[in-house]
């Protein structure tokens, strides 16, 4: 892992990867890659490599690599992605995808909420408003409500959220 990481972080990383491929070392190590974009983040570099073997990453490195790969599969950075994955991972994936960093920062700053705790209604309040017991349906409803707020289809205001829930209750129950 350390030796490959040194190659990935080198200014001559493309040459290093070509040599690994040329001498069939990629096959031996269970690595493959095609198009490759340099990033200043090692997880971003590793996320672009397909790995057939278990490489000893830390838990955080593994999580970030998987998140970056998920975003790369989607081929875009949206408000939903920024909310779900956060700014850091989205910036790395955006760099690989060729998306302007300033656009990602601007989109992130314009998010009405950044975490579940920012929603003006708690899970308990949602249950009380709808007069239902906590359940998977209510959790899904909360998730849907968060998406509506993120995409500015409803404002993150307690009264408006309550109205929205009551108006759309029949969708879920």
Where are these regions (language model features)?
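C-terminal subdomains that position terminal phosphate/3'-OH groups for nucleotidyl transfer/ligation
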Residues: 19-173
